[in-house]
Amino acid sequence: MNKARSDLLGITDVKKSLITLAIPATIAMIVTGLYNLVDTIFVGQGVNETAIGALGIANPVQLIIMAFALMIGIGSASIFSRAYGRKDKETMHRSVNTALFMGVVFSAIISIVGLVFLEDMLRLFGATGENIGYAVDYLNIILIGLVPFSLQVILNNLVRAEGRAKIAMISMLIGAVTNIVLDPIFIFDWGFGMGVKGAALATVFARIAAFIYVFKAAISKKSKLDIRLKTLHQIDLHMVVQISATGFSSFVRNAMGAFLVILINNIIRRIAIDGDVASS
């Protein structure tokens, strides 16, 4: 880690450090919200209102995926930061490699389970016969592109832990801008005319672009993350438990948002059904 980042984490005035790290993190959080907003705007213009409803049904799935990725990312970042303070390079390395291993495995499992039980899951989340087709089209593509997305979330937390919050911010900006550019090209008839599938594809490509940027930063000589791809497959069960336990509160907090959306979707569906029955 270079002297400037070392000073930031260990010597610089606390207020200055908080501002330096908090501003990029805040911008990154705002940018995160742009993904679904941009998809919704372009889908509304390029497809129809039913497709917008489908994105709302699909949103809890993405929130749950994000909750898992943040659990791993925040848990590993916390362990990495404490190890860095102790100058414990072995624990720093194990926390990073284990987090990446967990990201790949968890993402693969969620993708497979999600693709197999997608329609049943969406009906549980409040989908109707009108919008479930759009939701399936959207999530079939999103789930396939899950691994780079999860790794991007994990690496963003880890680069923040080593004092490079700007890298995480730029990664998110790259993803958001790429999504904004690709959405109309893939969705509208003057482009590829793929509709909801186009929105999902644009999102996946945007996330891949963001992942490539943060991954290159993470393996650069300036980074202290010490990613060793050759040993990535080696399982450290003790570290898996540590990361999961440390990040579990974050998982619960983020997953609760997904369950709230699911509850609202089902209430809306129930009201709509009751209204149709009453009008008939």
Please give the residue ranges for each predicted region.
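Alpha-helical transmembrane segments of multi-pass membrane transporters/permeases
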Residues: 103, 158-181, 197-204
